[in-house]
Structures are given as structure tokens and as C-alpha cells.
């Protein structure tokens, strides 16, 4: 089910206009000199199991390239929040989003970038496993 969750998050991001998706390592941005922005990074954190469900915690990060004068800083962060919010509204109805919190950032990778990351917790019933 873990793989299915990551694949679905990737699919939803691409449907919303994300050009590049990385899984598990935000610093892959530095290893790709010809990267296409915006980028979505899906990183797993803690996974818990109960008798009936899997509980996954992820950090979803939206990254876009910053103008030299940083004039698009707030636009990038605002767009990132809106995109991540839309992504979360489109997760399957049988997945329970129990929490989400957002934080903006400014970061130098190979490019000067800005964006927002969102910690989420999803509960997925074991009955949903294909």
C-alpha cells in the first residue's frame, strides 16, 4: 500500500501541473542540472500499523525557482500552498487525512528556490490494499 500511496500522490501532483517529482530525497534537486520546475518532493517519515489500517506520515514539498530579485517569493509560496491543498482535496475518499500543516521556505539548491512544505498524516484501511 505504501507504494500505491506514493504513486497516487505523484499522479495527483502531475495532474496539477508539477513538472518533476522526486521521492525520498529533496537534495535530488542538486543532482539534476536540467530540472524542470515546479518540483514536488514526496518524503516519508513515520509509518504506523494497527490491526485495521496503515498510518503514513509524509512531507510534501513544493519547490519553484526564485527570480534573481526575489520578486516572486510570495507568489511561489502562495501557489505552493494552493497546489498542495488541491492535491490533498483530491486524495481518494477512503483515505483519511488526519492532519496537515504548512511552512514556507527559501533555499539554495543548484538554483535559488522557494516554496512550501506540508506535513501530512494519512490513514489507509488495510482493506484498501490491492
Please place each PLM-identified region on the residue numbering.
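Charged, amphipathic alpha-helical segments and their flanking helix caps
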Residues: 1-24, 28, 41-130
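Low-complexity, acidic Ser/Thr/Pro/Gly-rich terminal tails and inter-domain linkers that flank the onset
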Residues: 33-43
